UniProtKB/Swiss-Prot annotation:
Topological type in the membrane: Single-pass membrane protein
Entry-linked Pfam families: POM121
Protein family per UniProt: Belongs to the POM121 family.
Gene Ontology cellular component annotations, sorted alphabetically: membrane
Ranges annotated as biased composition (Low complexity): 66-76, 599-612
Descriptive protein name: Putative POM121-like protein 1-like
Keywords from the named record: Membrane, Transmembrane, Transmembrane helix
InterPro entries named among the record's database cross-references: POM121-like_prot_1
Amino acid sequence: MPEQDKDPRVQENPDDQRTVPEVTGDARSAFWPLRDNGGPSPFVPRPGPLQTDLHAQSSEIRYNHTSQTSWTSSSTKRNAISSSYSSTGGLPGLKQRRGPASSRCQLTLSYSKTVSEDRPQAVSSGHTRCEKGADTAPGQTIAPTGGSPRSQDSRPRRRKIPLLPRRRGEPLMLPPPLELGYRVTAEDLHLEKETAFQRINSALHVEDKAIPDCRPSRPSHTLSSLATGASGGPPVSKAPTMDAQQDRPKSQDSLGLLAPLASAAEVPSTAPVSGKKHRPPGPLFSSSDPLPATSYHSRDTAQVTSLIPATFTAASRDAGMRRTRSAPAAATAAPPPSTLNNTSGSLLNAVDGGPSHFLASATAAARAQRSEVRYNQRSQTSRTRSCLKRNASSSSSSHSSTEGLQELKRRRGPASSHCQLAHSSSNTVSEDGPQAVSSGHRCENKAGTAPGQTLAPRGGSPRSQASRPHINSALYVEDKAISDCRPSRPSHTLSSLATGASGGPPVSKAPTMDAQQDRPKSQDCLGLVAPLASAAEVPSTAPVSGKKHRPPGPLFSSSDPLPATSSHSRDSAQVTSLIPATFTAASRDAGMRRTRPGTSAPAAAAAALPPSTLNPTSGSLLNAVDGGPSHFLASATAAARAQRSEVRYNQRSQTSRTRSCLKRNASSSSHSSTEGLQELKRRRGPASSHCQLAHSSSNTVSEDGPQAVSSGHRCENKAGTAPGQTLAPRGGYPRSQASRPRINSALHVEDKAISDCRPSRPSHTLSSLATGASGGPPVSKAPTMDAQQDRPKSQDCLGLLAPLASAAEVSSTAPVSGKKHRPPGPLFSSSDPLPATSSHSGDSAQDTSLIPAPFTPASRDAGIRRMFRVRNCLRGLGLFLLVFSFFFLLTWASFSF
């Protein structure tokens, strides 16, 4: 056996994967390979007699194994081993037994090959298993590639002469080459699967006869399949048309459980209730939802038409829907019946119900969207007086009259088509989100509709909050600002930007003047931005200098949080934009000219600004529109304040030509008496009411902060009042420093610049930007030329702002020379360091007096140069230490080694 293992007589051909079994005993092989390189080669016979005295069992094993491999060979070369070692006994009987069914033995070839090398008995057992496998599945045959297995009659007959001689010692006669078989490939298995599928399809072909035509079936098909869940037979659609019903056999219905549903669906509905169109199902019913066992019988999606009996045609249904409209234009709004979806259910549950097995969240969302679509369609078709009739549930007093609205629509012309555009786009956009509902419902009054209330639609029947959860939540955000079909006021945009809630898209702004006068001023319900809305409601006619009121721009954004003190951090320079419409620029100039000494015309009192708009502590009317919180960008704030400062300074310096407060008091005591103050009030007339209001509020506000105190005591002369001295108020009794610690500290900052009640220079805007402190809203002043000449120039105490002060002092005489006050430019920003007394700067115009004169730019440059020298010295010292440490380490390393 070991010698035979080393003998390379046993070879394997890679082409047909044939293995030559081992030969036991001393028998020699009659063949040798044509090449010795191990490549694929046939065996050729060796000269000499063949030893035929082999064991019968070995001969049988060799025959069984070679007969298996010969059938799977694809080459045309002859198999010499099987022909030479096969015995004549039992060969015809084996061929007859194998027959056509022997092709199934090829499946176990891989197993028999591997086992045959170790145990030759496994080959015979595997071959026996293959022979028995041909009879295991009667009636089933494997379809080969050619289409049918080869039978014995199709092969050429083998010779009946025995191949091997019966006597020993005679030479072996080689038989003719055997006819090779074929392999079972993946294509054969695929054909077998296709055959099985065809058999199944042929069985299902009987069921396909139940479908009469390609027209849509009723939605009750989906309802029945959903109701049963796992029905044995598919529900069949009923009654698409009259003639089709007559031709169709009536014995197709096999679901007895759905008989009541089918009978209910057969009953024709006389007309759609309240003229509603069939809702599109939205995302509730989609093809991605899992269907029951009978889901493969689903028909086309446009199957709703077949639910209506033949006598109830689409034309009659459209006519009924047109009768329920309020205008003939409703006929065009009805979609064609073929676009309706069958998956929305039958007439029993098509509108709002939906199957019970769907999720509640999806059902609520789908209902909300369907309600939006129907609601938009009704509002689209009801064009007659749709924007005039107001909902009874909303506040009717907060809306403008219908006559004013019609007049506005006639004046506005093509711009009034905004409602139509919103309605036309609401049908498509409403599928995306609740925001689109706001555009569709713009013509309806929804003010005051809380989430817990009910909304009365146009159809007349109220829908509860449970049936419209998303619509009411979306409308509640919007009903605070939108009240009619006209473009909403600028307060809508301001409020949405200030609060950060953009419930509805902002609409175009600024309707005409008379339309605004007709509109009540109580329409705004957003508490935080109510002053904003009322301020933006009144259009500013234009400042005297001809400049338009600037748009909010980037100052108002929904991403900026509003600080808690934002209502008191504005500049009183914003009064220009808050002038009512009837208060024109001409009347204001006339009033300012008539209120000078010697005049007390009644028109001046009417033309004067309202006291509430002048008081810095009055709230958001002074600081809501233009100032912006302190955290807004400094560049935008500086530009806005500079423009307003120029406008006010130019107009006040031009109109205040009469020397209202000519007398100056350098000793700071002339204006402290009550007589001088009364004389000043008599000269200034009604325009001096600002000082009175400030005084009346100073007693209460002075306890809250020094900012209000400074504005309250503005008409008193406080120059020269040191922190340690006492201040004599109007009451006549002195107040000590201990009783008024914060007041004196605030007045000490203020008394260097304020000497009368006239408007101060426009440098207050520059200084307030430089200090960055908005402690109290400064009140604008405007001194004249002679007053500026009389003012001493030694009032400075903030060293850092010396260059700023010099620039502001030069530009203060600009109105006399006809030049406008220059804008501050980028010199002043909120990022500059704040001085210690910045919180006490009640009037931003007073910061000019806080600049010390001795501190020049040259001294500041010298300090910068000293800093550079110190830095260079430190760098040199660090470099020296680094070099020294390097040499020290080098020396230590040299000594250590």
